Amino acid sequence: MQRAFNIASLKVTVIGAARSGLAAARLLHQKGVTVFLTELSPAESYPEAAAILANERIPHEFGGHSDRMYESDLIVVSPGVPSDAPVLLEAERRGMPVISEIEVGAMFIDGPIIAVTGTNGKTTTTTLAGEICKASGRNTLVGGNIGLAFTDALLVHPLPVDITVLEVSSFQLDTCVSFHPSTAIITTITPDHLNRYHGSFQEYVASKQRIFMNQNAQDNLIYSQDNPVVEHAVKTARARLFPVSVQQRLSRGGWRENGHLMIDAGFGGEVLVRVEDLQVRGAHNHMNVLMAALAARLEGIPIDVIRQAVLEFRGVEHRLEFVIELDGGTW
């Protein structure tokens, strides 16, 4: 993981006392970094965070942003803070670097990172990729925009981490500077959250493209070839490209063929599973499975381990889940 900052030598301001901001401040404080947290809302809005900050003696303020926040070398921003917030515009005017909580977590990870973004499918893909990595016996951290915030997970997860699997939102990517996943996945891109991007779909696409901006020819980028926006977006990538399709057979990446899911991560075409043996149904889930399996294979996990984890995967809670076939229907 390349690091743009020697964080230990810096004074850092964290904006926002919600879960990711609080976690970032706590992690930095535990690592010996001089940190200050500032929150616009009053302490009554975040009683648990206020108590934790006081108990752990982390300097902080609630109810507004004082000039103290600019007495630092670096600003860490929560994903809920829009890029055009006055405090961030002022930081930009002062020439202060601003990074995301995701990037803070990555500074304390040495192993490979699988990062997943996309409008739809990223939670299922992230969850399955994490399950596969765990099944391989690797010490696997799963977090980001799913479950625990990345820095929160690092507070409780035993170190060292062998491999990290992250769900990353466009909001988190907006302020990434040196974030460098060894394997990145873009599931889909369709219009979403455009109010955050001044109504511009192109700005939203550009945010998703940031997941691969620091990748090089030794890294991997998995993407949906069935989504024209994604297919066009990855043309600027420097990483090795691995397309995935459920509509056509491919020469590398992942695809459906004769009732099977197939992957080729550079080891030749490998049969992953029969579609009928999956516990998750639908073309969208076939795409998610192919992407997660391909990412794991690219990170060196044996195909038999991947296959077994895929067959056992029942999907994500509150998502579409197969129950039974009855009276000619699927429920």
Region spans (language model):
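Short beta-strand "acidic-cap" motif of Rossmann-like dinucleotide-binding folds
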Residues: 34-39, 141-142, 165, 243
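Hydrophobic residues within alpha-helices
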Residues: 24, 125-129, 295
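Active-site-proximal loop->helix
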Residues: 47-52, 113, 152-157, 321-323
